Swiss-Prot record:
Protein name: tRNA modification GTPase MnmE
Assembly behavior: Homodimer. Heterotetramer of two MnmE and two MnmG subunits.
Alphabetized PANTHER family for the sequence: TRNA MODIFICATION GTPASE GTPBP3 (PTHR42714), TRNA MODIFICATION GTPASE GTPBP3, MITOCHONDRIAL (PTHR42714:SF2)
GO BP annotations, alphabetical order: tRNA methylation; tRNA wobble uridine modification
Entry similarity comment: Belongs to the TRAFAC class TrmE-Era-EngA-EngB-Septin-like GTPase superfamily. TrmE GTPase family.
Main subcellular location of this protein, as a coarse class: cytoplasm
Matches recorded under Pfam families: MMR_HSR1, MnmE_helical, TrmE_N
UniProt-annotated location(s): Cytoplasm
Keywords assigned by UniProt, alphabetized: Cytoplasm, GTP-binding, Hydrolase, Magnesium, Metal-binding, Nucleotide-binding, Potassium, tRNA processing
Cofactor detail note: Binds 1 potassium ion per subunit.
Gene coding for it: mnmE
Ligand binding ((6S)-5-formyl-5,6,7,8-tetrahydrofolate): 23, 88, 127, 461
Lineage: Bacteria, Bacillati, Bacillota, Clostridia, Peptostreptococcales
Xref: PROSITE patterns: G_TRME
Stored InterPro entries: G_TrmE (IPR031168), GTP-bd (IPR006073), GTP-bd_TrmE_N (IPR018948), GTPase_MnmE (IPR004520), MnmE_dom2 (IPR027368), MnmE_helical (IPR025867), P-loop_NTPase (IPR027417), Small_GTP-bd (IPR005225)
Organism: Alkaliphilus metalliredigens (strain QYMF)
Amino acid sequence: MFLDDTIAAIATAHGEAGIGIVRISGEKALHIIDQVFQSKQGKKLKDISPRRITYGHIIDTERNERIDEVLVSYMKGPHTYTTEDVVEINCHGGMIPVKRILELILRKGARAADAGEFTKRAFLNGRIDLAQAEAVMDLVSAKTDMGFDVALNQLEGSLSKRVKKVKDELLDMLAHIEVSIDFSDEDVDEVTLDLLLKQSMEIEKKIKVLLETADTGKILREGLNTVIVGKPNVGKSSLLNALLKESRAIVTEVPGTTRDAIEEHFNIRGIPLNLIDTAGIRETEDIVEKIGVERSKAFFNKADLIILMLDASRELTPEDLQIMELVKSKKALILVNKTDLTSQIDYDRIIEIVGEKKVIKISLIEESGLEEVEEALVEIVYKGETRAKDSLLVTNVRHKNALERALESLTDGVQAIKQKMPLDFVEVDVKNAWDALGEITGDTVGEDLLDHIFQNFCIGK
């Protein structure tokens, strides 16, 4: 990528809309727009004060064609999104106007922007760091209000500031270590070792605090993969319909109606759920149903959360017991349905098998217990804590991996200090921790990783 050229792209979604926006960034942005834009007052944009919206038309002078009626804004660098000169053309929405305007801009000397290149330039030009750049994509793809708020906080630098503070503390450690190494002809005193150990352990705690938020952050970013399991005709499809508040799955009294998994994406109290209603798990000779059962088991193994449904009106069957044994090692909710009927189920046996898992009594036909189910989901995701809008969460898997590597290196450093190993070994561990944290903010990343990150962005962002 060349920062000295001028790029252009359509910045709005494809399709019919009220307006469309074409964005230009680079040192030739003003020169290019003045070749194609005619303002109503007849002035060139270079003769109009920046940060004003100017009415006029986009004209293809070579073909003597008026392309569209537009509003154009010019923002002079460095106080822009990319820190470069930026022009935005607001035209009529739809595929044709933006496409024709972009083609004209490219003919006048701009280059078609790569995916995420505007944000990448903002990063490379120092306006934002890499964590903030990634937050832009999280903001665009947020599935819930909470996810949006967390992304906005990261865009404003909440994670970056926390990571930078830890990195600065690691630099202080490195300074102490290097001074001690410079005087290597003298023994390292206990005071120095105690100080380094104290610093290391305090930084360890801070990294662990960040890592503890990663599971919740991942759910807010990607959704909670939740699988409803149970034997046939226990109410799995009815639960899916009740949570969706619409009839999505077929509900009958015939066991085995759901032959394949049904997947829905929706929000419950700000939690994005990827909810999968699976075929009932049982022994069957039906080939199609058997395939569905095998798929159910595959979804079960990959799930973040299992919702196991049992039938209160029947005694526990070998199938129930088999599924409960599988659930023991997973994060799970146990829902006992059909509590409106005479109870035949052994609750003590359920508790004996699943242990501390939450057991909720519900009746889908009477619509009772659903609120408690929603509350349990919130408790599982937020681990019983109340999350404020300005909560700092680690939502990016790349950030989590970097924090884990930093923690591992720092833990090695702590052990080296405790064992009174040469400080050169400690220095390597502390430097590795610093490098790992630098990957979050972009201080220690290569071009290949940057390309990989930004290729997932939208064109025009």
